[in-house]
Regions:
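Glycosyltransferase catalytic domains, chiefly GT-A lineage
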Residues: 1-289
Length: 289
């Protein structure tokens, strides 16, 4: 595979810490993101026995309990909430409409951690996932969660819920962090400004250091044994209401101006600040009448 070709020099050391490596041939013309989704939706065909799949942007915190896996297919809701209350509800709804897919009535399952049994039912489910992911790709959507949740709908919600502690999505909540089995820190779509990130493994500078440092285990020793130390000292988790407010386009525009080093952006920001002060004063005056 294409990934195997990159495992040279210092990067090859990671193979010393694996029990088994399987090389799957993929289309070399596809980008890494598409290849990873292809493998993800096909993985049931390449692995024997029941297994727990986890995304690469995750960090183990505590041992698993096999008794927690009681159904053929299991996952955790995206955002740890019902779909109706999910901050990206409207986004997923519009994307599903574009793809002509169905959306769940209760939970939109996050594809980052999935338990999959080795049964005929699960093999059929995974085959259908791959087929619908290909349909999604043909329509320009290469991510896998839309097809996953559509196939879950077609199979009468076959995906049952595992304990939330197996997929603690720290960008959404810290509710399950204390008893976390696995932290899902979301390494994709990183911010340009690393000061906005609350977790060390979300930062591009961290992974650049990993690539340059051949002694991988010494670099990760502290992280594996003390994962909570990866949080920034100034980490703040907003409540749902605040997150919705921050999705407002006005805030987004002002935030863009504040980050820009351009002269015109600084001028516009000053004008906005002056306008905001005048608006607050006028609002207070009118409210007293």
């Amino acid at each position: 595979g294409e990934t195997e070709k990159t495992l040279v020099d210092s990067r090859k050391k990671i193979l010393d810490y694996t029990d088994e490596v399987r090389v799957i041939k993929c289309d070399p013309h596809q980008n890494p993101m598409v290849r990873s989704r292809f493998l993800k939706t096909m993985m049931r065909e390449y692995i024997e026995g029941d297994f727990l799949y986890v995304d690469g942007d995750t960090l183990w915190v505590n041992p698993i309990n096999k008794e927690d896996f009681s159904a053929d297919v299991m996952g955790v809701p995206d955002g740890h909430v019902e779909f109706e209350k999910f901050i990206y509800h409207d986004y997923h709804l519009s994307l599903a409409k574009k793809l002509d897919f169905k959306t769940p009535s209760k939970f939109f399952i996050n594809g980052g951690v999935l338990f999959l049994r080795d049964t005929p039912v699960v093999h059929e489910f995974m085959k259908s996932w791959n087929e619908h992911w290909n349909i999604s790709c043909e329509k320009g959507c290469y991510t896998d969660q839309q097809s996953l949740n559509h196939v879950n709908y077609l199979n009468n919600n076959i995906i049952k819920l595992m304990p939330h502690s197996y997929n603690v999505q720290i960008v959404f909540t810290i509710r399950y962090l204390l008893n976390a089995k696995l932290i899902h820190y979301f390494g994709t779509g990183l911010y340009e400004n690393e000061d906005e990130l609350c977790f060390e493994l979300q930062k591009k500078s961290f992974w650049s250091h990993v690539k340059e440092n051949a002694n991988i285990m010494s670099l990760f020793e502290d992280i594996v044994t003390k994962p909570y130390k990866c949080f920034s000292t100034s980490s703040i988790k907003l409540n749902y209401k605040s997150e919705i407010e921050l999705k407002n386009p006005i805030y987004g525009f002002i935030n863009t101006l504040a980050k820009s080093s351009k002269v015109h952006a600084k001028v516009l920001l000053k004008i906005f600040n002056m306008g905001a002060r005048l608006s607050v004063a006028l609002f207070s005056l009118l409210s007293k009448k």
